[in-house]
Amino acid sequence: MLHRLLFGLVAVASLTLVGCAHSPQQLSPQPKLNSPLTAVGQGQPVVVRVADGRPSPVLGTRGGLYPETSAISVSGQDILPKLQAQAEAAVRLLGFTPSANAYNAPQLTLTLAELKYQSPKEGMYVTEADMTATFRVDVQNSSRRYSGRYGASLNQRFGMAPNQATNTKLVGDVLSDALTRAFKDPTIGQMLGQ
């Protein structure tokens, strides 16, 4: 009898601990421009490139009892084609024509400089997370150069630990805000059009 009771307690304790551990999440966010842009170009060609300047695809951890097992990541292979499509769409909205090999055309390089997800380290339950995204935009037009950094952040509170779909949406939202902020900078359109 005592043996069964002890076994039952061990089983319940094991399930409780498992409930506090979070598995890793590989996110596939969909960044999108979320505000209209003002056209300043007349269809001139622009070479558009994107790069991943992050030191690692890992954004951070989901926290919880064992944060080292709960990494959140976004791979460069997943995010770069989406950023390329959005950067080209932004250049079109600004009135220019994205062109892969245009000779002597202005160049715009969008670099994902930082993407972070931080949740409190203490405590068994994830109740909030801070997400930040930073892009660097480099524009070169003949001898003129411009470089700017554009960021966005988001603090989200949760009633329970967020699932993969929730984190994917939140990271996509913060990427979208930073991306839109970058292309709303009038200096970029002016530099491309000179």
Task: Identify the residue ranges that each predicted region occupies.
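Sec-dependent bacterial lipoprotein signal peptides
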Residues: 1-20
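A short, structural micro-pattern
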Residues: 9, 42, 129-131
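A structural "domain/chain start" motif
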Residues: 20-82, 187-194
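Surface-exposed short loop/turn segments
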Residues: 21-29, 94-147, 153-161
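Short secondary-structure boundary motifs at beta->alpha junctions and helix caps
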Residues: 66-78, 142-193
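Mid-chain, structured segments of secreted extracytoplasmic proteins
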Residues: 73-100
